[in-house]
Design a protein with these regions (language model features):
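Beta-strand-turn-beta hairpins that frame and shape the catalytic cleft
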Residues: 1-4, 123-138, 144
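Metal-dependent catalytic neighborhoods of phosphoester/phosphodiester hydrolases
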Residues: 49-66, 83-102, 108
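Conserved small/polar residues in nucleotide/adenosyl-binding loops
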Residues: 147-153
Length: 155
């Protein structure tokens, strides 16, 4: 199984008033080429997809166009995306019903079960080779304050 790990795309970023859009477009084209050339099975995007929790429409189009194109060109590619500190976890997860049809799994929000414990099953993503589970990815998004584990105060 070949896993390609990326992070910190920061789509939509300007750097000292320099718009990095062209740079991002070139990166995404290069990434598609690498996935094709090296026959990648899993693409892991570990946070900071966007530079802002409220990305521009153009940045979102760039992101979704990339996901559509790369999954169309590589039907067996599995993509796992986790939210970083620059991303809006809820915004990243919002299109999950559509993305799941493209074999894209997004984990942005740490969920809790009925007992109030972190739902670890939600964070464990099976990785497949030829339809068989061959590994697991623990897809833990950036821990925001309300998801931190708390220790008992009476010790």
């Amino acid at each position: 199984m070949k896993i390609l790990h990326t992070a910190d795309w920061h789509l939509g970023q300007t750097f000292y008033e320099y718009d990095r859009r062209e740079e991002h477009l070139h990166f995404l084209e290069w990434l598609k080429q690498q996935i094709r050339q090296h026959e990648i099975d899993v693409l892991l995007i570990a946070g900071d997809v966007f530079d802002s929790p409220n990305p521009s429409a153009e940045s979102q189009r760039m992101y979704y166009r990339f996901l559509r194109e790369v999954t169309s060109e590589n039907p067996s590619l599995q993509i796992i995306i986790i939210a970083g500190n620059h991303d809006s976890a809820a915004r990243l997860e919002a299109p999950n019903p559509l993305l799941e049809d493209m074999n894209v799994t997004v984990r942005g929000v740490v969920r809790r079960n009925a007992e109030g414990d972190i739902d670890l099953q939600h964070l464990i993503v099976p990785l497949y080779t030829e339809g068989e589970v061959t590994a697991y990815c623990l897809a833990v998004p950036y821990p925001v304050s309300y998801t931190h584990l708390t220790l008992p105060t009476n010790r």
